[in-house]
């Protein structure tokens, strides 16, 4: 993944974009 992808190990609403979080997650209201 890239920013905006939803990965199985992450909450679908979590914000990983522009942070130090190692997973890539989508923010539904932005993506």
UniProtKB/Swiss-Prot annotation:
The lineage of its organism: Eukaryota, Metazoa, Ecdysozoa, Arthropoda, Chelicerata. The keyword Glycosyltransferase does not apply. It is found in: Secreted. Keywords: Disulfide bond, Ion channel impairing toxin, Ionotropic glutamate receptor inhibitor, Knottin, Neurotoxin, Postsynaptic neurotoxin, Secreted, Toxin, Voltage-gated sodium channel impairing toxin. One of its GO terms (molecular function) is toxin activity. Signal peptide: none annotated. This is U13-ctenitoxin-Co1a. GO terms for cellular component: extracellular region; host cell postsynaptic membrane. Its main location: secreted. Disulfide bonds join 3-17, 10-23. The keyword Transmembrane helix does not apply. The presence of a 'disulfide through disulfide knot' structurally defines this protein as a knottin. Expressed by the venom gland. Belongs to the neurotoxin 03 (Tx2) family. 05 subfamily. Insecticidal neurotoxin that reversibly inhibits the N-methyl-D-aspartate (NMDA)-subtype of ionotropic glutamate receptor (GRIN) and inhibits inactivation of insect sodium channels (Nav). In vivo, is highly toxic to insects.
């Amino acid at each position: 993944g890239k920013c905006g992808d939803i990965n199985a190990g992450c909450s679908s609403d979590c914000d990983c974009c522009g942070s130090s979080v190692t997973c890539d997650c989508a923010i539904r209201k932005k993506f």
